Design a protein with these regions (language model features):
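Domain-level signal for soluble alpha/beta catalytic cores
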Residues: 1-330
Length: 330
């Protein structure tokens, strides 16, 4: 039997996948703004291809594309009545791409329905999570990733509903311009509270680029002996605007802010040094980023063909400029 996520994490860091909705938007399959996952039924081949790119890059976990896949969010783009089709398709596609090479995580996310101190809103969130997770479990997932929570209160509801499944649960928070959640909780408080509530893995994802996320991971690591996850977007955020959704290019002109593969590899190395156990990426991270992160973490990845240059043959432009750069005194 294949090792589960918790067994793998006890042995070594685990490499996650990259971002989906912004990349699929760039490829013409997702609407900028809503970023809902109807592509799983409307353009399944595009989703499958992106999953496969991440697997080939070295990802050890593939997430079902079910971010913003609850009934209420899907209803904003006219797909509320297809919540079951979309979530089941999301898991099937992830499973098809993963094969026996990667684990498949179900996916839950913030619902925008949560209201602090409102039992009625909490029950509404519970119902949305239960429905979405139920459809995903019909197909079969290895564990649950609940992500991008701006309120610790809503994240705790994800822990509560996820643990009912009997599967391991990973829950990650997001932090905007302030170093606390919208309900005033620090990264340390979030990590400790989530682990104490039963989350198997706690951490942070999205919004903040690596430079502005890693200090939060360090704070979480100091707060608990539990497993810590980090999934940073591959965007260069600034001290003035530490969250990428606040940058002028968001949502559909983010190319100037994208980090290089080598910058994401350095992020992976730093995350491991801090003590993160699950290291993945988020919006803006494509297969080239994941491949370089895999190399940085000593993970296997599909490498290009092994070739040796023949000095008697003309060089290609790439070889020529690489050779010239190697001998340059600049």
């Amino acid at each position: 039997m294949a090792k589960g996520i918790l067994e793998r994490l006890r042995e070594d860091v685990v490499l996650g996948d990259g971002g989906y909705v912004l990349e699929l938007e760039k490829r013409g399959y997702v609407l900028a703004g809503p970023f809902t996952p109807e592509a799983t039924v409307e353009n399944p081949d595009a989703v499958l291809e992106l999953h496969r790119e991440f697997v080939d890059g070295g990802a050890e976990v593939i997430q079902a594309l079910a971010f913003y896949g609850d009934r209420e969010k899907l209803a904003t783009v006219g797909y509320g009545d297809r919540v079951g089709d979309i979530n089941r398709a999301a898991v099937r596609l992830a499973r098809q791409a993963a094969g026996n090479r990667a684990l498949v995580a179900g996916n839950l996310s913030m619902t925008w329905q949560f209201e602090p101190e409102s039992p009625k809103a909490a029950d509404r969130v519970r119902a949305l999570l239960d429905e979405q997770l139920g459809h995903q479990m019909e197909v079969g997932i290895d564990f649950i990733i609940a992500e991008t929570y701006l309120y610790l209160g809503e994240a705790l509801l994800a822990v509560e509903r996820g643990k009912r499944s009997g599967l391991p649960v990973m829950v990650t928070m997001s932090f905007e311009d302030k170093l606390v959640t919208r309900d005033g909780k620090s990264p340390a408080e979030c990590a400790k509270t989530l682990i104490d509530a039963g989350a198997d893995i706690a951490g942070t994802n999205c919004w903040r680029g690596p430079k502005h996320m890693l200090p939060l991971v360090e704070e979480m690591r100091r707060a608990t002996d539990g497993l810590i996850a980090v999934q940073a977007p591959a965007y260069r955020t600034t001290d003035a605007t530490p969250f990428f959704t606040g940058l002028k290019g968001f949502p559909d002109a983010m190319e100037p802010y994208q980090l290089t593969r080598h910058e994401m590899a350095e992020y992976a190395r730093q995350a491991k040094a801090i003590g993160a156990n699950f290291i993945g990426a988020c919006c803006g991270a494509v297969a080239t980023h994941i491949r370089e992160m895999a190399r940085a973490l000593g993970k296997p990845t599909r490498e290009p063909s092994r070739w040796k240059p023949d000095p008697t043959k003309p060089m290609s432009a790439t070889e020529y400029y690489r050779d010239r750069r190697a001998h340059s005194k600049d």
